[in-house]
């Protein structure tokens, strides 16, 4: 399929695992006029390439993948560096050069490939990897290999968070800065060693595909957070722990809100322990929880998002007081990376955009798996554990958009809970 759809002026790069049939097909592609590079990533592949090229009478177009010591930090750091699944060490690269020289095929080696990692967040890691890759290029040219193409592999990040930071779901550089660093590293080595300037190709799959898809889902049900806006004052004969919780709520106007919240959390824990030991009845425990959640709402109203010491508690209360919103999709099918590695995706309401959201929510899918829940949400300053949404209106549909799911999500998603495929619309 790749050969059939390849443009005459395009290139096809064959990397990854290769068996004899794969290599034969790649050589046939070269024979019929395509620029098909077979990238040698294991020494055993070189034997197969030489055997099949002789059998078909086709001079191969070869590349070699070098394994860099430089790696980019993050969830995918071991896709590059010494622990990479693919690539040749320095000693193995020398063995490839000598074998090709002995077979009079050194002229066929035209591409050098390396992979710095995936979703590299810090531009300094790209700079380090490119310096090492540029040195490899100079050394291969010195050994007589006519390398004309440098394949810098993947690594170009996607800023899922919008924070322009070194967080693993972000990137602290632009696409232009990435390109400038790639070109600069190779230009410098070419200028220093008086080498020809190679063509540069990349395999920036995530950066090319992440933005191409959005998942749209409708809200099916909402489980409201515990809400007793104005609990009544406790009677004189109610347990002391309830009296303490009530006194804390009443003191909020005169005390720091964080202090009141910490006391309320302590007293609630004490009340739950007393219930476990039979000291409190179920009705008394429920009463304690009502006063506690009322305290939480009152404290949240007094916290300032711009005050640093309030941020952690504010995020905690937003999650604690969030509604559970059940959406018509499967997390495991449509957002598997969120479940597996805490990948963050931007999520926004698509309905009632002319209204300010007044509730906080945690999204749940409709599988029977308790892990079917979105735990991390992009906001204006990073990542939070709840999402601002509108209060539901009876009988009115409410849609949510989950953005930037175009890279790997659909292909990785499974048939968990026997959910069928999501309907697709191509625009």
Mark where each language-model region is:
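Generic preference for well-ordered secondary structure
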Residues: 10, 33, 70, 77-80, ...
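Short linear functional motifs in flexible/disordered or boundary regions
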Residues: 76, 124, 145, 162-164, ...
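Short, low-complexity, polar/charged sequence segments that are solvent-exposed and flexible
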Residues: 31-33, 56-60, 81-85, 130-133, ...
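Charged (often Lys/Glu-rich) extended helix/loop segments that serve as interaction or gating elements
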Residues: 181-183, 187-427
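Active-site-proximal beta-alpha core segment in soluble small-molecule metabolic enzymes
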Residues: 1-151, 156-161, 172-177, 185, ...
